[in-house]
UniProtKB/Swiss-Prot annotation:
Family recorded in the similarity comment: Belongs to the tetrahydrofolate dehydrogenase/cyclohydrolase family.
PANTHER family: C-1-TETRAHYDROFOLATE SYNTHASE, CYTOPLASMIC (PTHR48099:SF5), C-1-TETRAHYDROFOLATE SYNTHASE, CYTOPLASMIC-RELATED (PTHR48099)
Upper classification of the organism: Bacteria, Pseudomonadati, Pseudomonadota, Alphaproteobacteria, Hyphomicrobiales
Quaternary structure and partners: Homodimer.
Protein name: Bifunctional protein FolD 1
Residues engaged in binding NADP(+): G168, R169, S170, S193, I234
Job of this protein: Catalyzes the oxidation of 5,10-methylenetetrahydrofolate to 5,10-methenyltetrahydrofolate and then the hydrolysis of 5,10-methenyltetrahydrofolate to 10-formyltetrahydrofolate.
The organism's place on the tree of life at top rank: Bacteria
Pfam families the UniProt entry points to: THF_DHG_CYH, THF_DHG_CYH_C
Amino acid sequence: MAEVIDGKSVAEDVVRTVKALTAELVAKGKAKPGLAVVIVGEDPASQVYVASKSRTAKECGFHSLQHTLPAETSEEALLKIIADLNADPAVNGILVQLPLPAHIDAGKIIQAIAPQKDVDGFHFINVGKLGTGELDTAFVPCTPAGSMLLIQRVRGKDLSGLNAVVVGRSNIVGKPMANLLLAANCTVTIAHSRTKDLPALARTADILVAAVGRPEMIKGDWVKPGATVIDVGINRIPAPEKGEGKSRLVGDVAYAEAARQAGAITPVPGGVGPMTIAMLMANTLASAYLAAGLKRPTF
């Protein structure tokens, strides 16, 4: 059976480190990191997620700021708030919780965030820096950054020569994940819905990353023996065994089957999920260090 990669434990390590480095920054007479979270509307899942981000920011010793705006907020009003946050030296990270209401252009909002405060890593400048290997000053999207940390906990920092297959080509996970693996000297293939003979391709992977949003699509016999499997998917499926109308969370990988083949695998829940908020804190801390003229910490 595969080693189970405990994302919750690694995320707790990251948060502990962020907390300690925040205390060091303040001890040097610098301002504590500031994270501003902006939420528009009353989507219940977004509310829960934002509350968790704000709570973790406070735990890290950050200055935590939250703007909760009504669903009818205009694009112009939201852009004004972002401009104010861009100009505020007490704010190092700005995060706009997605999705936004239909009348607001999410792309326009994200590109309005100052790149040095774009701790989600979605601004074109940060995307470009990641794509060209400028990792010293880039902010990497939190889910792939967290996934990479989990891979390195198993495989070490140097991944030279390993074959990596990323299933999924989204701008939020698939593409940045592939760029991170390239930067670590992997041989990388990106697969997607049009890929021919995906099972055969997946079997070549020493590192297999699943980020397609299809429940248990990747079967056990798609996994190379000893591979490291990172399951980014979070899917809710019916669970009649729990009672009528009940559901359960599964990933994009058929976990029980894959765990018999893999060398190491992330569970769902408890794998990649906890890493996302932890890496948001790491990015905010890095922004504060860079703003103070200090070398950013690495994780």
